[in-house]
């Protein structure tokens, strides 16, 4: 009894206990309405990706390895689009926090136009140099795996313009506080992907299907359906703050807003592209370790992404919450809420990772029955659980910083940690010392550790708000009118 009383007293004396009611309000009124739909949307996307992997895995180990190699390059491009999407989200959230709907609409419209045109150019270049890209990415993979990876890449690059529209449109809606529409659209899109891809791969009734080609074609068709849905939602004004008519996309560009979006998006995109490029390089390390290791590595990343879903959702929510608070000048509130989201993510993810690690073999069996592949997956998932306590400091904190338009610091930290730790340490341990895929993943965890230390230091010192403080005096200046 004395022990329980002492414990209650310890809890009572903490700062958390004194502010527990305000934290409860924050959780239910601000974090939950944003994070839960984002979590459900991301869960739907990842689960549909898992089901897509199941569909391809039934075609054999080579097919799964081919998709994994092609997707490792596709992730570089998607990371770039997602970074510009982040810039749009922050500008929209900040503009609406200041009750400037017109600026939010113009930022959304111009981001969609510019990134769609860029995606078309990018798809053309990648389609032309596809063979050289796969040779670079696949390393010492077999000829059969390279051929399948090239086929999948050439089909999926056709979906880049649609992916850009869907990502940026969804990001703008989230910035406006509407997370349910992106959830509905992206959820439906991914269900369609499974249905269409399943039919195209394996056929229907007497039609035998297209086999492996159907996987890439189904994804491309589904993405274009999603892009049309996003443009339609914006055109009818489902969210009144972001009503954008189709004819408005042909209006002249406003470069002041473009630079505002790109001021966040470009550092974030440099960070994302360099990060995913480094990850692609580590994928090349794994590519020479055999088909079983390639497949096991691919499956382990898929499972780890599922485990990290709540943290990813909280990171996206922290960007929006921070942008909103700073948009109305509530600096102290933004700082308090970011800390709350960070600790919530850290404790939650650690618990999830440690509880799911004992079932790694069961989860791997949903993807494959190959014992060698399952063995690789089990080892990597246990390692992932061991280092999960530092994940949120590595990823949730910089997401919140970007809501304060502090994107450059995250860019430099990511460059340092990715190339100094993930690539170098991964190569030394995985290749030079012969640790294999475990050494490559240890390089990834070293990357997490460096990021965690530097981002946590920036949070506790308050330096992530310096850029915002410098921009505050400009609020009194009269801004030029923004034409739509």
Label the predicted regions.
Residues 33-52, 155, 222-226, 230, ...:
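Transmembrane helical elements of multi-pass membrane transporters/channels
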Residues 85, 155-174, 182-190, 215-231, ...:
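Short runs within selected transmembrane alpha-helices of multi-pass transporters and secretion channels
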Residues 61-72, 149, 153, 216, ...:
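Small-residue hotspots at the loop-to-helix junctions and early N-terminal turns
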Residues 64-124, 163-182, 294-360, 391-414:
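Small-residue-rich hydrophobic transmembrane alpha-helices
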Residues 22-54, 58-59, 75-87, 119-123, ...:
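N-terminal transmembrane alpha-helices
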Residues 38, 42, 53-54, 71, ...:
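Transmembrane alpha-helix boundary and packing residues in multipass membrane permease domains
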